[in-house]
Regions:
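Peripheral, non-transmembrane regulatory/ligand-interaction domains of membrane transport proteins
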Residues: 1-159
Length: 159
């Protein structure tokens, strides 16, 4: 938190303790008939995919970890997210909340996990915008893996 002292509100500063590394961007584009999963997309590929998206499909972008604040800010800019939303995504100690904006809904949740006698929490942010879901997680492993596996099944009710 001390790294944010004196900065303007909306500054994209990561407050967690995960080592800074390039985020892994995974895109999942699906409808009732088809699903396409792309691993390790670059920001340029993400922009290209976003520009060619049609309204008949759902577009899920999952990003982790969020330690590379500049890349997260660029993704926020691509999807026209308010700078305060990007700041909250990067503030891993932020309390859970839900906020409704004109163009999207922003949600911060904490994922609790008990392992080896220790309770730990992961910071997860979600943005729901039209047919797009953006999910940002502070730590790996992927907390959404079971959901993704269910989406891959052709007869899944989730589609």
């Amino acid at each position: 938190m001390t790294e944010k002292i004196g900065l303007a509100p909306g500054s994209a500063i990561y407050t967690g303790n995960v080592e800074v590394s390039a985020p892994i961007i995974q895109t999942i584009i699906y409808n009732k008939e088809n699903i396409t999963i792309t691993e390790n997309q670059s920001l340029e590929q993400l922009q290209e995919t976003y520009n060619t998206l049609d309204n008949e499909k759902t577009f899920w972008i999952h990003v982790e970890p969020i330690s590379a604040q500049n890349e997260i800010a660029k993704i926020g800019s691509l999807f026209d997210l308010h700078s305060l939303v990007v700041e909250d995504m990067l503030s891993v100690n932020h309390r859970p909340k839900a906020e409704e904006f004109d163009e999207y809904i922003f949600i911060v949740i904490k994922y609790a996990e008990y392992s080896s006698g220790e309770l730990t929490f992961s910071h997860i942010s979600l943005v729901l915008k039209d047919n797009i879901l953006l999910s940002f997680a502070d730590k790996t492993p992927d907390k959404f893996e079971n959901i993704k596996k269910r989406l891959e099944k052709k007869d899944a009710r989730m589609r």
